[in-house]
Amino acid sequence: LFINGCTLPHPERYRVAHQIEQLISQGLTADSVFYDRLSLDQLKYYRGFVFFRCPITDTVRNFIKQANYFNKTCFFDIDDLVIDQKYTDSIEYVQKMSDEDKHLYNDGVNRMRETLTLCSHAITTTTQLQEELQKYIKGQVLINRNVASDEMISRSNAAIKAVNKNEDKVIIGYFSGSITHNEDFDLVIPSLIK
C-alpha cells in the first residue's frame, strides 16, 4: 500500500502511480491512499507500506508502530531533501517566504522527517539522496529512479512521429515541477547562451 502525503499531482504520478505500475508489471498488486484517509484497518490487507512524502500524524505514527509489531515492512519514499531544514533553509525560494509561510513549510519538513525515522527502510531516486537519507534510518535505502509510465512512452513516441522538425533550431525543455528547482536551471543558462 502506498500512502501518499503529497498534494501536488506530478510527484504522486512519478513516485506512487509509476511505482505501482512497475509492481503490477512484475505480477504484484498494489494500491494507494492519501495519508489523511489511512486507517489501521488497512494493516491486515497488505504486507508492505510505502509512505511517500508523508508528514507524521497520530494515525501515521500508530500505523507504523502496528505494522512493525506485525512484522510488516514500512518504507519512506522521497525524491527530494525536504526532510530537514538544514537542506531546505539554503533554498532561495524558501528563504524568500513570509514568516508565516516558512513556519508552515518547516512544519511539513519536520513532520516528514519524523515519518522517515519511524520507517525501517527508504526509497529514493539518486545516489546522493541515498547517502543523505542513510543518515536518518538504520535500514536500507534503495534507489528506484523516476521513470516514464507506459502511457507517457506511448504518447511521446506518437508526438515524435507527428512533429515537424526544424534543423536550424535546438529546443530544450526543462520541466522540474518544483519552483524550488528554478535555481538548478539557472546554473546551466550561461552554457546555453554560448
Residue ranges of predicted features:
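Conserved catalytic-core segment of nucleotide-activated headgroup transferases in glycan assembly
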Residues: 2-28, 146-194
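Short N-terminal targeting/anchoring amphipathic segment
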Residues: 42-59, 73-77
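Membrane-proximal helix-turn-helix segments that form the acceptor-binding/catalytic region
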Residues: 65-69, 99-122
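Helix-loop-beta element that forms the nucleotide-linked donor phosphate-binding surface
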Residues: 118, 129-150, 155-157
